[in-house]
Amino acid sequence: MRTKKAFLLLTFNVLIYLAACQETERILANNGTEDNEITTSKGVSPNTNPLFLSNSTAGLYDSKGRIRLTIGHIGAIGALRNDVKILEVSHKALQAEGILDDDLDVEIISQTGCGESYEGVAVAADMYHLQKVKAFIGPYCNAEMDAVARMAAFWNIPIIGYMAASNNLADKNAYPTLARISLRTTNSIAEATCAMLRHYGWNKVAIITNTGILAYDRVLSFEEVFHQRGINVVKKIMFDEFADSKAMIASGLLNDIKNSARIVVCLFSNTRESSREFLTAANTQGMNVNEYGYVFPWLQDGGKDASPWTGADGSMLQKVKDQYANAIIIDDVNSFDNTIVGPFIERIKDVGLTEADVDIANIYGYLYLFDALKLYAIAARKVLNETGKAENLLNGRMMWQNMRKLKFVGMVGASGIASGQVSMDDRAERAPLYRGFFVSPNSDSVLPMVHMEPTMLDNCDGIANKSGCYEIVVTDIMRDFWPSVDRKMPKDEPDCGYRNERCDYTLIIIGAALILLFIVAAVSAFFAQKILEKRALDKLPFRIYRDDLQFIDEEQLKSMLSLGSTRTKMSNMNYGSRNHAIVGTNTHAIYHKYVQRRPIVFNRADKTLIQLMKAAVHDNINPFLGMVWNEREEMLLVWKFCSRGTLQDIIYNESIQLDTKFHGAFIRDILAGLEYLHASQIGYHGSLTPWSCLIDRNWMIKLTDYGIADPLERWEKSQSISRDGLTSDDDKSQATQATSILYESPEMLKNREKNRVRRVDQDWMRQTQTRRQLGDVYAFGLVMYEIIFRALPFPEGTNQSELVEWLRDGSKVVKPTIPQNKVLNMDLSALIQDCWNTTPEMRPSLRRIKLNVETYLNIKGSLVDQMTRMMEQYANNLEKLVAERTGMLEEANQRADRLLSQLLPAYVANELKLGRPVPPKTFTSSTVLFSDIVGFTEMCQNASPLEVVAVLNGIFDGFDQFIARKDAYKVETIGDAYMVVSGVPEENGHRHINEIASIALDVHKFLSEFIVPHKRDTKVQCRLGFHTGPVAAAVVGLNAPRYCLFGDTVNMASRMESNSEPGKTQISETAKNLLLKEYPDYICEQRGEIPIKGKGLCMTYWLMGTKSEGSGRSGAYLAPSMKSAGTGFTGMLGNSANDYSLNLKNPTGLQR
């Protein structure tokens, strides 16, 4: 309604404008006449009325008299960049082809319209009246094309549409001068759609659309064509214009499609977005199945959008494409490829344009614009050539008549592109050229399915019958492509109707009921059989339920093996991590675990065999306790536990010495077990190996794994069980099983290979019981050789893995042999080789083997007696070893005690050894002595580090020797400093002052005789000082503990030493008083008061010596007087033969 109102208002304004312009022209013309006559007329004929005449021939010729036609191009705001350049390309092409030349040429005036205010209509009026255009190309949009086409018809000038696609514009009674060059008009794509529907026999369709004027016009166009061609629209469903998939589902309208149609034609305003939402809804409702066909005439206004499953960056959106699976899209033949882009870019290079200068997404707009100008020029040349009158070029109807059924090559037609060939129909509309594309779910690109091309009809008037006078011929490109069972296209209506009302299902119901009854009966019988079998299996004596097993972990097993006093270390050898469990209350068992993949089915022979295994009782047969199966996807074979492991463990344990008695006892026990099995209903062992021979606590061999070999192999072949569950510690592991092939006789290997290649449904090839027993003899020969020589009977250096592979694939024949370097009784050697005979019948019987073995191995007595003697010898050796190790321990303890007593006081060391703490202790009276070597720094500078260390070792070793003879304790040495205490850690009354004083005198005497090795002319002097008083003592530190002294007495003693003089001993007044009081034999000389740090002025004394030494005793030491005291090393030179010298080879010791 808005468009019609605007058109009427604009037309009224234009008519007023035209009348005013015509009146002005008439007055001006009359004023210019010679007699100034004004002519009037009471009536105006259609040929002279300005409302029915084209503008005059003025402006038709240029100044040189050549025809120049002015064409007005009305584009769109914001669409088709550089569209004027495209017209320029077309103009150049027309000149190059000779259609336009000097006598006929065109001038193009280009302006834009298609805005919100219908600017294009005003532009058309302006072009016609003021710029004197003779034809129009455009406008771009439908609304303005409707108005301008009517005005052009009114003015009788040709107008060519190149983008407007409305079906209304095909009415030539309303638009008699309008030709359209666009390939994608609504009426043409409707014709193509109708042709494809009829091609597949789809005469009943539903139309899906949405609200809005554009969708409404499209539906009207399609309904009109469908009605003309006999296509029945059974249902028309309309969604809201902007409805999404959820809203479509919520509306419930999709159910109407299910109940009324199977072929759906989708016509939306926004084809790209709305179609995607609709298919999403259809998929959600389960309507995207093979019996539905969705047809999408790809109608778009303006430029061509990318496919719905193409993202903004050009990538494919797979989920969106999956929604379009099995959809059919009708579009231009080059819609889904870029074949037209290359030729188009080549054509626009003539005017300096590149791909970046145009809107490639709207490439069809450029092509149609080029073709529109060419259509007009060809028609103009045709009119001019046929009539020879230039004024006929202004006759719009005549020009339109010459555009009908016109064919020419379009912009890209020269490149062989089908859509580049222009063919006009009988209404001057471009004949449709389309394809149907199938969106395959199995291909990344769409697949062309049909080609639709028009064929013009003869003797047809398109104006009279309102058609283009052509018939669309549909050609199959693909056949049998629909993803249904029969590969055929779906039908437009189900065979049985939408509600199955056309089919009689009585017979089908009866048949289905019978089949269902049969299935129920079969299933019931199957489950009844399973229940009966389960009850029968539940009653089998060898069945053990998994809940009846108490599994034992490694820690529990160690605890159990340590309980019995009769068990030895050999009792639990190699059994610390195997599979152990308790069956019932207290039966210790081991189990082999197999992964169960399918339920195990026992046949009668299996049940009989396993029951016989369960009932087997013999001293040399290990009891079979039972099986666990069909529980937790695993099968367990449970055997009684033997505490000393397997025969293999004993054979290859080098710490165990085996003599001929062991050999004979083991071989005798194995033979006894085999004799019992061969005489029983079990009949054979079947898998005799060293690890299937267990040893109990009494060193008796017990055979295990007997009889079960055949069922295990058959169950593994049928994939009921797998050995993947066997751990590496299990003696039935895959590695062990691989090695077991060495113990199988050649005929057994051949039989196994035959069974391996047989199908599961074929019968299992069994060996006779006799052959099985002879196979045991072959394995016994290998085990007997292994017992005697603790090795396999193959040459040394043979790779066991390669040997196993050779035997498995049969690529190389390897026979066991006795190496020449093995010493063995000739008769026994011949017996073993007879057991290995490749001809089973040539092997000896068990009775013959038993007689020969007893003779050759001289088996007497029991193995228990041999073990008793061996244990006695072992106990004697153990007592001797314990005595030796005890002596070594005592010696190590003594060395540790001596070292500890040197590091700590004996009392403290004893307390620490006993683990008792040593608390700090205060001593009320003790004497602390400090000494320091004079000039030690200078000595270090003038000597090497090793020489300095040698001097210190010599001095301090001498100090240590005579301190050791005193009741004193060396606290520590720090560099050249030496600290001694007496009265600590053991109190000794007042005797400590005498001990320290005598030590001080001995030190001076020792140094007076000491010779520096590397400087024999140098004498060593030291300063000494001591003080008497209370101290505190404690052990400090957990790592490397030290016995330390604390208190003011220690500090005062240190001050006495630091303020002393070389070669002298300074003592405090307290020490002098106690010394002279208790021991008056000592001589002390007053030094006087000197400043002491932290004490002020203190009276100190020199210790000069003893009276007994001063009376002339040989070697007596007397301190020099203060006047003659020296301060260096040179004051005291000793030339006596008793001088001490340092032994550099033993720097810690002194030699005289």
Curated annotation (Swiss-Prot):
Binding site for Mg(2+) 1: 932, 976
Residues annotated for Mg(2+) 2 binding in this entry: 932-933, 976
Coiled-coil residues: 861-899
Residue ranges crossing the lipid bilayer per the database entry: 507-527
Keywords carried by this UniProt record: ATP-binding, Cell membrane, Cell projection, cGMP biosynthesis, Coiled coil, Glycoprotein, GTP-binding, Lyase, Magnesium, Membrane, Metal-binding, Nucleotide-binding, Receptor, Signal, Transmembrane, Transmembrane helix
Activity regulation statement: Inhibited by chloride with an IC(50) of 60 mM.
Effect upon mutating residue 1057 to A: Enhanced basal guanylate cyclase activity
InterPro entries tied to this protein: A/G_cyclase, ANF_lig-bd_rcpt, Cyclic_nucleotide_synthase, Kinase-like_dom_sf, Nucleotide_cyclase, Peripla_BP_I, Prot_kinase_dom, Ser-Thr/Tyr_kinase_cat_dom
Domain Guanylate cyclase: 927-1057
Subcellular location field: Cell membrane; Cell projection, Cilium
GO molecular function: ATP binding; GTP binding; guanylate cyclase activity; metal ion binding; peptide receptor activity; protein kinase activity
Enzyme class: lyase
Family annotation (PROSITE patterns): GUANYLATE_CYCLASE_2, PROTEIN_KINASE_DOM
Signal peptide: 1-21
Family to which the UniProt record says this protein belongs: Belongs to the adenylyl cyclase class-4/guanylyl cyclase family.
Protein name stated in the entry: Receptor-type guanylate cyclase gcy-8
Organism: Caenorhabditis elegans
Highest classification ranks of the organism: Eukaryota, Metazoa, Ecdysozoa, Nematoda, Chromadorea
